[in-house]
């Protein structure tokens, strides 16, 4: 299969189940909301080494938020319900409560269950906290130096999908990077998904474990390193490829991840110099979801 002359390899992305939350962060201005959303989703690229996977889903205009202010929906994900509960409390408490003019609301419509994050955080008010109702939502109002911080009492979580992915192979590092950025921009329009790596782009693909060091849980994927293509016997890098980037996607469900992969691949294939699109998997032995690239189109 080809798209705009770019080979789409007949392979699949192997994705995994993960617990997902969606949190709406509002503030007095779009800029302030973006700052808080960015802070709360930091250090959230992969649960290989981070305490959560997190990213910004989408912007929400004032006319669509409970308090009539601009906001951003973020997603925070973790395989463990207990760990996700902890991460929500920590990231909202340290990344959003501390940010100027912010408020926080649940943004997950079809939750499997709810966690009482706002109820727990209200105790920061040290007895001065109050209970309100906004747009039919139970809200805790916590007095802070600049006014009151508002947070919804409960936040929904559900079973989502993590690790949807594809590799972009270009004739140069520059072409592959431009295509990766185009892919991330396209995926940003797919609601219910995030690309949790820096700028949405993975530069250092990894494999499980190590060939040499027993103490490592993960190490560089030498088969996908362009500078090793003449050194590694079973390299997966074509001779004319000199730049590779990976896009990893987390979503509220498989359908959202599939749509994001499709739109991202289509966008990547519009960039000159892109030679091939592939995907990462573990032979189908680890992940519950096997997303075939050809089936996306």
Curated annotation (Swiss-Prot):
InterPro entries: ForMFR_H4MPT_ForTrfase (IPR014053), ForMFR_H4MPT_ForTrfase_C (IPR002770), ForMFR_H4MPT_ForTrfase_fd-like (IPR023447), ForMFR_H4MPT_ForTrfase_N (IPR022667). Its EC number is 2.3.1.101. The lineage of its organism: Archaea, Methanobacteriati, Methanobacteriota, Methanomada group, Methanobacteria. It is found in: Cytoplasm. This is Formylmethanofuran--tetrahydromethanopterin formyltransferase. Its main location: cytoplasm. Pfam families: FTR, FTR_C. GO terms for biological process: methanogenesis, from carbon dioxide; one-carbon metabolic process. One of its GO terms (cellular component) is cytoplasm. Catalyzes the reversible transfer of a formyl group from formylmethanofuran (formyl-MFR) to tetrahydromethanopterin (H(4)MPT) to produce 5-formyl tetrahydromethanopterin (5-formyl-H(4)MPT) and methanofuran (MFR). Homotetramer. Keywords: Acyltransferase, Cytoplasm, Methanogenesis, One-carbon metabolism, Transferase. Belongs to the FTR family. Gene3D superfamilies: 3.30.70.520. HAMAP family: FTR. It catalyses: N-formylmethanofuran + 5,6,7,8-tetrahydromethanopterin + H(+) = N(5)-formyl-5,6,7,8-tetrahydromethanopterin + methanofuran. It is an enzyme of class 2 (transferase). GO terms for molecular function: formylmethanofuran-tetrahydromethanopterin N-formyltransferase activity. Pathway: One-carbon metabolism; methanogenesis from CO(2); 5,10-methenyl-5,6,7,8-tetrahydromethanopterin from CO(2): step 2/3. It comes from Methanothermobacter thermautotrophicus (strain ATCC 29096 / DSM 1053 / JCM 10044 / NBRC 100330 / Delta H).
């Amino acid at each position: 299969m080809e798209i705009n002359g770019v080979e789409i390899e007949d392979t699949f992305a192997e994705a995994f189940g993960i617990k997902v939350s969606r949190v709406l962060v509002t503030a007095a201005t779009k800029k302030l909301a973006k700052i808080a959303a960015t802070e709360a989703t930091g250090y959230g690229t992969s649960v290989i080494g981070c305490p959560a996977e997190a990213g910004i889903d989408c912007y929400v205009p004032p006319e669509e938020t409970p308090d009539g202010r601009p906001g951003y929906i973020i997603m925070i994900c973790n395989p463990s319900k207990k760990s996700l509960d902890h991460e929500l409390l920590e990231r909202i408490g340290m990344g959003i409560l501390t940010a100027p003019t912010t408020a926080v609301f649940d943004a997950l419509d079809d939750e499997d269950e709810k966690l009482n994050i706002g109820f727990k955080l209200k105790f920061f008010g040290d007895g001065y906290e109050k209970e309100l109702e906004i747009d039919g939502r139970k809200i805790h109002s916590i007095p802070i130096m600049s006014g009151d911080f508002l947070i919804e009492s409960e936040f929904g979580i559900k079973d989502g999908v993590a690790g949807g992915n594809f590799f972009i192979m270009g004739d140069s590092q520059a072409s592959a990077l431009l295509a990766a950025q185009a892919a991330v921009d396209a995926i940003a329009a797919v609601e219910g998904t995030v690309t949790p790596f820096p700028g949405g782009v993975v530069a250092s693909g990894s494999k499980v474990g190590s060939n040499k060091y027993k103490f490592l849980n993960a190490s560089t994927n030498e088969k996908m390193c362009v500078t090793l293509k003449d050194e590694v016997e079973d390299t997966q890098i074509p001779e004319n490829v000199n730049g590779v980037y990976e896009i990893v996607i987390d979503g509220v469900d498989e359908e959202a991840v599939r749509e994001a992969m499709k739109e991202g691949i289509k966008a990547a294939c519009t960039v000159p110099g892109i030679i091939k699109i592939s995907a990462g998997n573990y032979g189908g032995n680890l992940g519950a979801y096997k997303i075939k690239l050809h089936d996306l189109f």
